[in-house]
Design a protein with these regions (language model features):
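ATP/nucleotide-binding catalytic cores
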Residues: 1-142
């Protein structure tokens, strides 16, 4: 099974939150880009300070999504399935309101997946039962 198949299976699992720890978040983001080309799912990427954009349309930022609170309000209000890749979201996870909003998204009626992507993720305890966790710790030999 290749990486794209594994990634697709993770997204199809019954978890609304996925945490992915990796030494190479850029490579994983590239895998999401590749996966989006062969999928009917809508994929979005959020980066701190840059906001949210749909993969394949990075030049079009989604308004009012730069701040984590506004981003999660946007994700919660989406009426369609989407995969939302949040890069380096640890600072926001320290805020109790952020955790509550993620729990609300995880329990929502509209199926969507929030992917927390970073080299290390300090996952708050209340989110652990709702989160599929993945750690990729191999470094490339050089």
């Amino acid at each position: 099974m290749n990486y794209l198949d594994q990634l697709d299976q993770m997204l199809d699992a019954n978890f609304r939150i996925v945490s992915m720890e990796t030494y190479d978040p850029e490579r994983v983001t590239d895998l999401f880009t590749q996966l989006s080309r062969f999928s009917n799912k809508a994929f979005y990427v959020w980066e701190n300070g840059a906001g949210l954009h749909r993969i394949g349309a990075s030049h079009i930022k989604i308004p009012r999504t730069v701040v984590p609170k506004e981003l999660l309000e946007h994700v919660d209000s989406c009426k369609h399935f989407g995969v939302f890749v949040l890069r380096d979201f640890n600072k926001a996870l320290a805020d109790e309101k952020t955790v509550q909003m993620l729990l609300r998204i995880a329990a929502g009626e509209v199926s969507k997946v929030v992917v927390l992507l970073s080299d290390f993720i300090d996952l708050p305890s209340p989110l652990k039962p709702f989160t599929l966790r993945s750690k990729h710790q191999m470094r490339q030999a050089g």
